[in-house]
């Protein structure tokens, strides 16, 4: 605990004093360091300046560069050798920034970590993993995307959703299906959630064509998905494809009473259908 000191004078300044590292236990000279894109296993504890523990994991597994953890942990881990124990003092710009993390990390709070690099290896390909592991990892990526989306970091959110979709597959290397009917259905459900979330992130990024394509991907898997129908109808209307937009929105409104979609989206669709009907009628 004495080593967990925010004012320690023997820090190695790595990035303009925003990330500072001190080795507590060095590894042998011939020990290796992980590379970008490899999977690492880290023992980690993070505290605020008042010593409140806000992050702790005795076996944190993540892939360097995939945004599974904050930037401070990625940057430090790639500098460590296997077996090394180090302190990392991270400015908020490399952790949780001006938003902090509810409910325990205030805005602009620096964090002090004690880290031990337990192991690292090449990232496993999704097609080599059992289906339950694919579902678990894919869902973790999706939840990380939700974390970024809520922070309005839409580029990172879209990246996380795409990585989740890469993981959420039931095929093998020879393109054969390897899942039970129940697993196949569960993977499909998570893919639909990821695709809907990805479309929302793409819209926030102004990627209208991509969002329309993603919405169509949702409807390929779930033709009665109301969120995707509303989004597709609105995007088609915005692009001037009025007849297809009207048919899509009509289908969404027909399904809507049995769904949880309410409020502004429904009002928008109702008035859009009226407007499109008038416009299309005037053409003939």
Range-by-range predicted roles:
Residues 1-221, 227-255, 261-284:
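Cross-family detector of peptidyl-prolyl cis-trans isomerase
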């Amino acid at each position: 605990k004495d080593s967990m000191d925010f004012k320690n004078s023997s820090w190695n300044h790595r990035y303009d004093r925003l990330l500072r590292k001190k080795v507590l236990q060095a590894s042998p000279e011939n020990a290796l360091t992980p590379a970008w894109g490899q999977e690492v296993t880290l023992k980690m504890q993070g505290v605020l300046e008042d010593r409140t523990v806000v992050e702790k994991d005795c076996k944190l597994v993540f892939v360097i560069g995939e945004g599974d953890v904050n930037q401070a942990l990625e940057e430090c881990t790639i500098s460590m050798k296997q077996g090394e124990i180090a302190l990392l003092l991270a400015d908020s710009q490399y952790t949780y920034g001006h938003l902090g993390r509810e409910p325990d990390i205030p805005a602009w709070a620096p964090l002090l970590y004690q880290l031990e690099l337990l192991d690292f290896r090449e990232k496993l390909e999704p097609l080599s993993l059992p289906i339950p592991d694919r579902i678990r990892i894919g869902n973790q990526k999706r939840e990380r995307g939700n974390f970024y989306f809520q922070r309005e970091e839409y580029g990172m959110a879209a990246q996380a959703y795409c990585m989740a979709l890469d993981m959420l597959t039931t095929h093998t290397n020879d393109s054969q299906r390897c899942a039970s009917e129940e697993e196949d259905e569960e993977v499909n459900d998570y893919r639909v959630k990821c695709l809907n979330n990805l479309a929302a992130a793409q819209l926030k990024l102004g990627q209208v064509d991509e969002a329309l394509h993603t919405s169509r991907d949702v409807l390929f898997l779930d033709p009665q998905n109301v969120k995707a129908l509303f989004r597709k109808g609105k995007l088609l209307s915005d692009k001037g494809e009025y007849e297809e937009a009207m048919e899509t929105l009509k289908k969404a409104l027909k399904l809507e009473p049995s769904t949880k979609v309410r409020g502004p989206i429904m009002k928008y669709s109702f008035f859009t259908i009226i407007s499109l009907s008038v416009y299309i009628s005037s053409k003939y």
